[in-house]
Amino acid sequence: MTKDLTKGKIMPLLVGFTIPLVLGNLFQLTYNAVDSIIVGQFVGKEALAAVGICNPVMTLMILFLNGLCMGASILMGTQFGAKDYNKLQRQISTTMLSGTVFSAILSLCCIIFSRPILKLLQVDPSIMDLTVSYMRIIFLGLIFTFLYNFFSSTLRALGDSQTPLYFLIASSLLNIFGDLFFVIVLKMGSNGCAISTVISEMMCCVFCIIYIQKRVEILRLGRKWLVFDNSLLKKTISYGWVSAMQQATVQLGKIGIQAIVNTMGVSVAAAFAVVNRIDDFAYTPEQNIGHAMTALMAQNKGANEKKRMKEGFKCGMVLEFIYGIILFAVCFILARPLMLLFVKDEEVILHGVKYLRLISFMYILPAATNGIQGYFRGIGDLKITLLSSFINMGVRVITAIPLVLVMGIGIEALPLSYLAGWIGMLIAELPLLIRNYRSIAK
């Protein structure tokens, strides 16, 4: 199923496109969240810290692949909006072939260098072997992660954000039952969670391939998948590497913060890991509204619908701010109940509640930046998103180092560093946004 975003009322289109994105990403986050809940409740805080420490590194690798998919999807959306179906098919096949090879190489490298990477992060020696084992199992499934994200990004570029949701619901249920079986029944600890996650990702990929073979003719596997267009590959890389670097910059900033947190002890590391899980769930809808704006902008740019591009930006920003306000209220009021979902250790809960309530105050700032980045991605100005993300993460780490390591403030310093990063990002983005927005109006 495909959908033309160049026609119809924009606010209902954005809401209708965003809701499946939000639900899909929440189910995807459930993969790792269920791991944390089950490990925290049935194994212990050492295993919970191991899973949490791995998450930023694993996400960094996955984001490199997602960057390729995102860059290609912007081109696909523009080609679909312009009704250039021949170029669209060549774009799809070129991205598929190059991404599969790259993900296989990346998976192998990550497995080999897992221990050196974790040593750089100053992981506590008492949980090093546990963390290495978990990370290596997860990286075995990297190629399945790419294939799913490729197919889902392609479907979204063609206006279909619902179908990927159905695949994720099925695979998330498999992951939950797999976690319960491997951890509680077989007593395999955090490794059992990793095995369950890989199996779930593989099945999600299989479901996606079966669907497109039967229902989406333009994506159906066949000889057309063997087409490799060097000129399109170069353009995809030019979009993809900027998108990948933008996402990688965000994750590298998180890894830098993780390294600082690891100096505070296992309890703080565990609290930080739990809040990061909660923050992922809370922050995802803001990102998804931005992604919906990207899809709408890309198709309407291809169709040269400038008026709809302007209206789409305004509608998207309204949605972002409404959600940011709701998010603050929920996370501040329900901080302790949310922590109790993941862990029983009272020291971990106290650290986590304090941290979560502080960061809840600033969710309105990423609401603004996500909307602005969705706009820039859709019109193809990806270097702006890279620059602003680099400023955000750089300011975060540079601010956190003296606050934590020199002044000894503790976990309370992290929200202050986040605030500084978001403000720096907005200062960088707003002048560029005004200039670009005016150019579209002409």
Enumerate the predicted regions with their spans.
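Short alpha-helical transmembrane segments in multi-pass integral membrane proteins
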Residues: 1-18, 76-141, 185-241, 297-362, ...
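Transmembrane helical elements of multi-pass membrane transporters/channels
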Residues: 16-35, 137, 148, 171, ...
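Small-residue-rich hydrophobic transmembrane alpha-helices
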Residues: 48-108, 145-164, 271-335, 366-380, ...
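Hydrophobic transmembrane alpha-helices of multi-pass small-molecule transporters
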Residues: 60-63, 175-180, 204-209, 281-284, ...
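Small-residue hotspots at the loop-to-helix junctions and early N-terminal turns
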Residues: 45-56, 135, 194, 266-281, ...
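N-terminal transmembrane alpha-helices
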Residues: 5-42, 56-71, 75, 100-107, ...
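Short runs within selected transmembrane alpha-helices of multi-pass transporters and secretion channels
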Residues: 69, 137-156, 164-172, 193-208, ...
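Helix-terminus/linker motif at the lipid-water interface of multi-pass membrane proteins
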Residues: 26, 30-49, 118-125, 181-188, ...
